[in-house]
UniProtKB/Swiss-Prot annotation:
Protein known as: Ribosomal RNA small subunit methyltransferase H
Subcellular location: Cytoplasm
Catalytic activities: cytidine(1402) in 16S rRNA + S-adenosyl-L-methionine = N(4)-methylcytidine(1402) in 16S rRNA + S-adenosyl-L-homocysteine + H(+)
Organism expressing this protein natively: Prosthecochloris aestuarii (strain DSM 271 / SK 413)
Record lineage: Bacteria, Pseudomonadati, Chlorobiota, Chlorobiia, Chlorobiales
Assigned keywords, A-Z: Cytoplasm, Methyltransferase, rRNA processing, S-adenosyl-L-methionine, Transferase
UniProt family annotation: Belongs to the methyltransferase superfamily. RsmH family.
Gene (name only): rsmH
Keyword Ligase carried by entry: no
Sites where the protein binds S-adenosyl-L-methionine: G34, G35, H36, D59, F86, D112, Q119
Length: 333
């Protein structure tokens, strides 16, 4: 698939094959440069479903929305772009339905988690220890606390907890201690390079330094953007929005997210048999969903060679079951 300077989307064919199956509303909650959205709309057009479908693209980043608008121009009449967080998708869907009188069912939702290559490679965003820039890390450049705010104001124990919990970094206490000592001695952190230097001073060996830097920057990014809390809300709201036979796909890039998605999808797809030992003949509640992917889908070796970012990606998909008397053709308001 052709791509532009924003970023090369991961597992495009797999996402499209698993999600773009029927006419309806499709949500790309992490629109980015619009690569996945373009592929989904292209597939719907080839299947003759374009005129009976609507794609809603959501992103916090106004630059991403501008990039995606250009890419999705061939489908402009069937695309709506909204600035916001994907945890707000239920409200966004309802707003568009009311505004346009749209009664199509929600048949597909995609969340491609993590930071885009464009954001990582843009120094002013402060996501990478490889790029000199302000220590920011906000997905929404206009809102909330930055990473600098956290490292400068958090107590040492709180900072250590963030680094350990969200980065799974074993030297979290030593790194937090060094960060707060640096604040006391030299003042507030402002640049990514300043934080990177402190981490390197604590961790010995180049390879270990690189791993610790990745973990510390990941931990701060997750904390700044409340990524796990946002994901939890989005999983609940997204599955609630789906019509029968509708599917939700989530692509994660680190173990914290993947474990959360795996656990949530498993719980949604299992019958409720009540407390252990009761010995019920029938479940108290039948599962309303089924797993489409029993194991996570990973990128092919060929794709990883072309796009190394795909190496850590894990895609999981769940489908809402059709209850007796229900159909995906039912109209939802």
């Amino acid at each position: 698939m052709e791509h532009d300077g924003y970023h090369l989307p991961v597992m495009v064919s797999e996402v499209t094959d698993l999600l773009a199956r029927r006419p309806g509303i499709y949500i790309d909650g992490t629109l980015g440069g619009g690569g996945h959205a373009f592929s989904v709309m292209s597939a719907l057009r080839r299947s003759g479903f374009e005129n009976d479908s609507l794609l809603i693209g959501i992103d916090q980043d106004s630059f991403a929305l501008e990039e995606a608008a250009g890419r999705l121009r061939p489908f402009a009449s069937r695309v709506r772009l909204e600035r916001g967080n994907f945890s707000e998708m239920a409200a966004i869907i309802e707003r568009i339905r009311l505004r346009e009188g749209c009664r199509l069912p929600v048949m597909g939702i995609l969340l491609d988690l993590g930071v885009s290559s464009f954001q990582i490679d843009t120094p002013d965003r402060g996501f990478s220890y490889l790029r000199q820039g302000p220590l920011d890390m906000r997905m929404d450049p206009d809102g909330g606390w930055s990473a600098a705010d956290i490292v400068n104001t958090a107590e040492e124990s709180e900072l250590a907890g963030i680094i350990y919990r969200y980065g799974e970094e074993k030297k979290s206490r030593a790194i937090a201690r060094a960060i707060k000592a640096r604040v006391r001695e030299k003042g507030d952190f402002r640049e990514t390079a300043e934080l990177a230097a402190v981490v390197r001073s604590v961790v010995a060996g180049h390879d270990r330094q690189i791993k610790s830097l990745s973990r510390v920057f990941q931990a701060l990014r997750i904390a700044v953007n409340d990524e796990l809390g946002v994901l939890e809300s989005a999983l609940e709201d997204g599955t609630a929005c789906l019509a029968p036979s509708g599917r939700m796909g989530v692509m994660s890039y680190h173990s914290l997210e993947d474990r959360m998605v795996k656990r949530f999808f498993r719980d949604k797809s299992e019958d409720d048999w009540g407390p252990k030992g009761v010995g019920l003949r029938e479940p108290l509640r039948s599962a309303g969903f089924k797993l489409v992917t029993r194991k996570s889908v990973v990128a092919s070796d060929d794709e990883v060679r072309i796009n190394p970012r795909a190496r850590s990606a894990r895609l999981r998909v769940i489908e809402k079951k059709e209850l007796e008397g229900e159909s995906h053709d039912r109209v939802y308001q």
